[in-house]
């Protein structure tokens, strides 16, 4: 833990090429269209460009059925400005946990779009390739988590790390609805790395990897204790990974966000 700035993404040329190949070879039997998925989905255009993510519960964290866009938008915005842009559209950002569930859905389950139609394997593979494959250009996305330290003695030593999430905009300020103390998470950067399968299978309710992690090729940057750290995931020719020590004011042309919507049309 330190106050020095660390990149959102890895910088060393260690690949995930074999992992990506395995993901793209995933086979599934394709069921018929599920018309129930599109019920109530009336607040956006082009539902065929969204993926249905069923609601889930993970310990104290739960969320409702939602639709995740296949593509990132709002490239070049920092974390706070991305939240503001999403709020103005009635959309929201994926939390780390939702991002984990999104990847698990793409890898292991039958995927439906917002109309209830099955998304073909080649399209699912292209989405996974865009998220995970180690190659240029740089592709990254913000995730809805910022980290704050509370209860420091004399504002210098000790303290507890909290993750704030489910952000909305209150009087023009990005404000979290939920905050959880971080316990049992992997402390310390792994460059590389952690095992992708292990992380996705055994992620904590927060979405962070457990302290009982397996070694692998996926880069991981722990949350900084500087009260200025946010989360994101990305890949480029130097590697791919989860960064929780990113600077909330950081920007890049390849860094965007998924403008998610609740299935019932609600907003945060």
Map each language-model feature to its residues.
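Charged, often glycine-rich, active-site loop that binds/positions anionic groups
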Residues: 100-118
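A short glycine-rich, aromatic-capped structural motif
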Residues: 2, 11-13, 17-105
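Histidine (H) residue identity feature
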Residues: 58, 74, 83, 108, ...
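N-terminal low-structure segments adjacent to metalloprotease catalytic domains
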Residues: 1-3, 246
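C-terminal, surface-exposed recognition/capping segments
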Residues: 112-268
């Amino acid at each position: 833990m330190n106050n020095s700035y660390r990149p959102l993404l890895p910088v060393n040329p260690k690949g995930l090429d074999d992992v990506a190949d395995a993901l793209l070879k995933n086979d599934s039997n394709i069921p018929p269209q599920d018309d129930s998925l599109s019920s109530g989905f009336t607040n956006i255009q082009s539902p065929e460009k969204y993926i249905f993510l069923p609601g889930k519960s993970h310990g104290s964290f739960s969320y409702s059925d939602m639709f995740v866009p296949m593509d990132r938008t709002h490239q070049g915005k920092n974390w706070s400005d991305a939240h503001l842009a999403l709020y103005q559209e009635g959309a929201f950002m994926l939390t780390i946990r939702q991002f984990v569930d999104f990847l698990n859905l793409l890898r292991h389950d039958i995927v439906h779009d917002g109309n209830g139609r099955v998304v073909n394997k080649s399209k699912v593979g292209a989405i996974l390739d865009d998220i995970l494959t180690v190659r240029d250009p740089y592709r990254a996305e913000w995730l809805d988590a910022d980290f704050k330290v509370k209860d420091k003695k004399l504002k210098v030593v000790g303290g507890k790390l909290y993750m704030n999430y489910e952000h909305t905009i209150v009087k023009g300020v990005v404000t979290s609805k939920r905050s959880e103390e971080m316990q049992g998470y992997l402390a310390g950067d792994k460059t590389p790395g952690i095992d992708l399968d292990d992380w996705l299978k055994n992620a904590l309710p927060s979405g962070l990897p457990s302290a009982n992690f397996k070694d692998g090729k996926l880069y991981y940057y722990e949350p900084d204790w500087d009260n200025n750290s946010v989360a994101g995931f990305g890949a480029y020719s130097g590697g791919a990974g989860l960064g929780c020590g990113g600077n909330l004011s950081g920007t890049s042309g390849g860094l965007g966000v998924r403008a998610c919507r609740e299935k019932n049309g609600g907003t945060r």
